[in-house]
Amino acid sequence: MMKMKEGEFMQTVREWILDRMKYKRKYGLERMRVLMSLLENPQDDYPIIHVTGTNGKGSTIAMLSSLFVYQGQKVGAFVSPHLIDYTDRFLIDGNVMSEEDFEIVGELVRQAEVTLIDEYEPLSFFEIMTAMALVYFSRKKVEVALLEVGIGGLLDTTNIVHSTMSVITSIGMDHEEMLGNTLEEIAIQKTGIFKQNQAVVLGNLPTEALQVAEVVGKAYNCDLHTFEREFKIELVEDGFIFTNADTQIHIPRLNLKGKYQLENAAVALECFLRFEKNFQLPISLSAVQESFQIVTWPGRMEVVHQRPTIILDGAHNVHALKQFVETVKQYGEDGDQQTILFSALKRKQYKEMVDYLRKELPEARLVVTTFEYAGAIEKTDYPTGEIEFVEDAYPFIEEYVTQATSKETLWITGSLYFISFIRKFFVK
């Protein structure tokens, strides 16, 4: 194959990336390792905290990022999926990548692909995104990078890094077609990110998954820090109290809503404290407290409208939906009208999710809808009419805003891609 010289590409970087979305994600690391070698292994230029989990990855990374920023450390974060634009996936100190940096870094990866495809197939979309993140963080000279796993861990594209620490936020049933049909099988995939002799922070894992993590951790001689064992969190009237073997910290307020976010906060804080201790870095207690009070994470219990209140939450699997329902039950006062607008992808357990919402929130009005994404559920998936279905979410929201009282709440939940679609309506 004849290589194209620099500047001869017929596509822009964005067009090239869009074209690569048609290629299925490859589960294997050889091609990615070759690519990073061509890019001079930028992932070796900074310490990395590698984060996996069924749910809670993004929120945990958001809190970790805030903790590092408030300590004055330059932190990069790679997250997925993006809610508005590709650049949302790449963050430095919480700020999204500029269009200029996107073009420059994307072009570097595209040039490397020209050499790569002499022996390998073209890169997949997620391989490009991961490579761009690792190059970007090196160019910006971050002091620490937070890397979110795409799916699983063991064979995930991100698992070519030699991380300083690993984190598992949670383990539940999701992506069974790729990860396995039991919690043990899924745990094997997620513990695949563990590295020899590293510190590992484990969230609130089910017993079956925790047992796998302990076996793998022992095999790799990892220093395991487990929720409710090495560290814990307690909700009090004026915030919450975090405790581990070294310290006890009172946090007046957590800006992220939902009881489950307390567990994510505990994981983030334990990870942060271990990292700073390992590198013998000083810690400002007031900065820790402030970081939790200002942290935000788009699309996760995000209030996008007041009077009436409209809240977005990407509860994209049954495990996350249970946490969502728990929060809804705690919200508001008796008699307040709650409306749930839900959509998901057909490949998910959407019928089980709808049934769960109907069972657990019988007083709420449940509305199912579709959205512009290949594989989204449609009205034909509910032919009997037993579920209220609207074809277009945008007019529904517009009507809701004009007719609902200030005491009513609209919860919009389901697929993260649905949340992205809805968020564009509010963030114009």
Walk through the language-model features, giving the residues of each.
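Hydrophobic anchor at the beta1->P-loop junction of P-loop NTPases
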Residues: 49-51
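Nucleotide phosphate-binding/pyrophosphate-handling subdomain across enzymes
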Residues: 144-147, 156-167, 171-175, 185, ...
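C-terminal helical cap/extension that packs against the catalytic core
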Residues: 206-221, 309-310, 352-410
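Hydrophobic positions on the alpha1 helix immediately C-terminal to the Walker A/P-loop
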Residues: 59-63
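Acidic, Mg2+-coordinating active-site environments of NTP-dependent enzymes
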Residues: 116-117, 140-148, 163-251, 265, ...
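Positively charged, low-complexity intrinsically disordered leader regions
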Residues: 3-47, 177
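ATP-dependent carboxylate-amine ligase catalytic core
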Residues: 5-9, 36-37, 41-44, 70-161
